[in-house]
Regions:
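A secondary-structure micro-motif
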Residues: 2-187
């Protein structure tokens, strides 16, 4: 499908077990039982069968630390599936099953039940992975942006196994970007 930035062949999924997890702090983390020995690196996406879980932030040889969506400094580029408008998620630190969807302009139609998916605009996640569903969308006359609450797809209270996403195309993107930069400097 031409809307995807990367081919499905560009993505490899590495299974891992969650061996540590917090859900009641402002800065929550997950620990998984896979690390650099298994091909895990920083900035890899993490999902489960329900949707997006988080992003790898630190790696040792046998383990990795994951920043989940329920971390107050985590933002994720996503889109409304029905109209393709792009926003970003933000967790307020209150409810481990809810996120805020920000940067959706007032002229965009947003309905309860709308599906929110990854945008595919970064090399971390392919486009179309479920993030959550719109639970509430409010707009006052003075607002330029919607106030949108999402029900997170992944249930952190039942998290046991995840998959770490390796984007095989990332190396090619970085190589071609660097080649373009260097070729421009040589002239």
């Amino acid at each position: 499908d031409s809307q995807y930035i990367y081919s499905h062949l560009d993505w490899e999924y590495i299974p891992a077990k969650v061996i540590g997890l917090t859900t009641h702090k402002q800065h929550n983390y997950l620990t998984i039982n896979k690390g650099s020995y298994d091909g895990i690196t920083e900035d890899m996406g993490v999902v489960n069968q329900d949707g997006v879980v988080g992003i790898v932030s630190a790696v040792s040889e046998r383990y990795a630390l994951v920043v989940p969506l329920i971390h107050t400094e985590m933002n994720l580029s996503c889109r409304i599936q029905t109209n393709n408008y792009i926003g970003r998620t933000h967790w307020l630190g209150l409810n481990s099953s809810q996120l805020q969807l920000e940067d959706i302009s007032r002229h965009v139609t947003v309905n309860k039940g709308d599906t929110i998916i990854t945008s595919g605009l970064t090399p971390v996640f392919p486009s179309g992975i479920l993030v959550g569903v719109v639970e509430q969308a409010n707009l006052t006359n003075s607002d330029n942006y919607h106030h949108i609450t999402l029900q997170i797809a992944a249930d952190y209270r039942k998290l046991s196994y995840v998959q770490v996403i390796h984007n095989r195309a990332t190396h090619n993107i970085e190589y071609h970007t660097n080649q373009s930069l260097w070729s421009g400097l040589e002239k």
